[in-house]
Amino acid sequence: MPDGKLFIGGEWETGTGEEIVSIFPADGSINCSLYGASKNDVLRAVKLAKSAQSQPSWRSLKPHERARYLYAIADGIEANIDRISQIQTRDTGKTLRETAILASSASGTFRYFGALLESSDDLLTAQRNDSLTMSVYEPLGLVSAITPWNSPIASDAQKIAPALAAGNAVLLKPSSWSPLVSLELAKIIESSGLPKGLFSV
């Protein structure tokens, strides 16, 4: 099981919020307990994310260069499907077969958005008369992703991958009923080399 620390601004730390107890739904046994994020933890994560996202090294990164990070995350999920499946089963009570499918789906989501970045073509309407036609792609900045308890890793991927692909930073708030697989995903995202501060749980 993950050690129950939060991932804020690229660092693992104990949250200063309320205690969260992760329970295995099949028998009611306790997986672990951890402390959630307090308001101050969240405000600090927001500040770090905004700072990281505004850095030219991320904000101005070419789409195909951002794709490398998404592929690395997809590879990390695939390499750890058994562990992710076990954690998600303990967290949600789903079968190992189902959680393996969800983990594989999450990997596919990151891979899809990576491929999209490498193959995106500008869709421009035909220029008329003396007009100027252009497409401008700008990140929004910071995306807050709130995901449900029942399919955490697949839901996480569906929010995180497009946000990172567009050049944003992401703050993930998983359900307090099933936070463990999201923390495991944070380890994979950290090992992908994604610049510090762009992702927090």
Regions from the PLM with identified roles:
Residues V21, S33, I87, E98, ...:
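Conserved beta-strand positions that form and line the central face of beta-propeller blades
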Residues M1-L34, E65-A72, S120-I146:
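Terminal low-complexity tails and localization/encapsulation signals of metabolic enzymes
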Residues T16, V42, I81, T99, ...:
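Alpha-helix N-cap/helix-start motif
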Residues N31-S120:
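Glycine-rich loop-to-alpha-helix module at the N-terminal edge of alpha/beta enzyme cores
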Residues D121-V201:
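Rossmann-like NAD(P) dinucleotide-binding subdomain of oxidoreductase/dehydrogenase enzymes
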